[in-house]
Amino acid sequence: MLTELVALDGGSFRMGSTQFYPEEAPVHTVTVTPFAIERHPVTNAQFGAFVSETGYRTVAEIAPDPALFPGAAAADLVPGALVFRATSGPVDLRDWRQWWDWIPGANWRHPSGPESSIEGRSEHPVVQVCYTDAVAYARWAGRRLPSEAEWEFAARGGATTTYPWGDEAAPGGRLMANTWQGRFPYRNDGALGWAGTSSVGVFPPNGYGLVDMIGNVWEWTTTRFTGRHRLGAPAAACCGPQAPDPSISQALKGGSHLCAPEYCHRYRPAARSPQSQDTATTHIGFRCVADG
């Protein structure tokens, strides 16, 4: 039931970028040791097997601790998660709160709220999993989450171009990843029929045979996010929290189906984004690695 691992020899590569967003700098040389990475993100079916065997409950399925939210109304301290909602028209893209809602009852089984389900989506990436949930699955699987350096090394697929497939986002008009097609955040024409997550492996693999490294869902890494790359940071990491710390943000990689050129041009290996450890959303998933 676990995802097939693809063995990578490791090596040195140039990590980061100075062409897009300041947090991707500086470009620097990083060496990663041999490791193996899952060919695709963890799916709903795979996460379901973990839950069935262990009885695990995700953070989104547990009511928030009142001690962490002093002054919050009891009615607000119920299980739930962040859900993307398309707007009715153009909005100020500087305010993400216009398209994200906290929905009671949203969790990995019901990604968009209590009335939604994952029926017929067993091969879609699992979402509504926070960092702690991803770490728990990885430990159950006898694996771990990748560091940011390991993830970027794998995502590049041996290439040095902007995207794993070249320097054009859609060469010859061909869509290479599940990203937002249309005008964000109010009109999504769908990528090859997908408006939201897509089944893993719909889009072409990179040079290492890995799929969905770019687009579909952002992926958790073990690297704590800083405003710029921290030179000398460990290229590998193997630990994670027993409980999420909302004051700590992890580095997300890969972009998602919500990334669009005019808003989030982060569907590239070098791109990175912060997310607090306790946050689950409709556009974040993960994949695991194993030591080589």
Where are these regions (language model features)?
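Short, structured beta-strand segments at or near domain termini in extracellular proteins/domains
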Residues: 282-292
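A short N-terminal beta-strand-loop micro-motif at the entrance of redox/enzyme domains
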Residues: 29-35
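Functional-site microenvironments in short loops/helix caps that host divalent-cation chemistry
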Residues: 7-8, 14, 18-19, 63-269, ...
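Short, P/G- and charge-enriched loop/turn segments at secondary-structure junctions
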Residues: 22-27, 94-96, 271-277
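GGW-centered surface loops in extracellular recognition modules
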Residues: 1-7
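Acidic-aromatic/histidine active-site loop/patch
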Residues: 43
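An anion-binding catalytic pocket shared by soluble metabolic enzymes
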Residues: 38
